[in-house]
Amino acid sequence: MRTERIKTDVLIIGGGTAGCFAAYVIGQKSERKVLIAEKANIKRSGCLAAGVNALNAYITEGRVPQDYVDYAKKDAHGIVREDLLLSMSERLNHVTKVMEDLGLVILKDENGKYVARGNRNIKINGENMKPILAKAAAEQENVTVLNHVNITDYKTENGKITGAVGFGVNEDIFYDIDAEAVLCATGGAAGLYRPNNPGFSRHKMWYPPFNTGAGYAMGLLSGAEMTTFEMRFIALRCKDTIAPTGTIAQGVGARQVNAHGDIYETKYGLTTSQRVYGTVMENREGNGPCYLRTEGISKEQEQDLYKAYLNMAPSQTLKWMEAARVLRKKRRDRRYRAIYRRRTYSQRLLGRQ
């Protein structure tokens, strides 16, 4: 294994959404040399690799950043850092404008205003969100991208991070990187619990299975101060496809119902954890399977759902289309059987004459 030594001003570990956006901003605002180290390829890596159909953190008209802080605090049952939330919330709309200027399509109404989905979300066509960001970052003259490089440890000196080391995923290279500043953007930790699907499908999950929590481990091993580990976000997902449920619940107002048709969301609550807990309890008590009731939605709403999931979780749209195809085939087979029975009966009558 050969060693490659690199010196840079800023090292960004992880080339997902946060890493690419940080590289783009630094590239725009300074002449500092930036290096992105990404263990996949920045074009389609990170939690937004497949896209997203809404920006779920936006200060909509008539709202203020503190409103978002209050919502997040309530949803997490108080287990939050309000100061960090407020700092983030105050910049949400600015970042959204930057993304739109880069080419992200944000849906607008007849008056040219963003189409809101609830009090904190706006609808987008975001299947290509990650390629847009990757291109913007890579085009900066002072930004260099190292794809397929897995960073494993920080370099420290006198209690300060001075760089990092790692290795090539596809090539037999050891990387020794010195940097004046290091930004960790490796994402969260997926796969901590038993997967929904067995065997080769065990990686069918919402967040990237290769978000291993390595960035957290590197920080802990280096003696860094860590925060907000007290709260674990676990969202409700659609069976088989692991597609988000908020698109259905908020998009068409679908209610959570059990196998008896009872609306159970009011029984447990509507925070993220309560929606998951309620579904688990209903199944444990023998009231499952549980559904999001879409019966009665208009044809236009149905098409909107199809398009929305194509921007984020196409497997859900494909599952619906396949189910519709199977249903049409069953109906067609029933009609053919009915026609055959009628013809047979007519022939029998004719035979008796």
Predicted regions and their residues:
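Glycine-rich FAD pyrophosphate-binding loop
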Residues: 28-50
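N-terminal Rossmann-like FAD-binding beta1-loop-alpha1 element of flavoenzymes
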Residues: 10-36
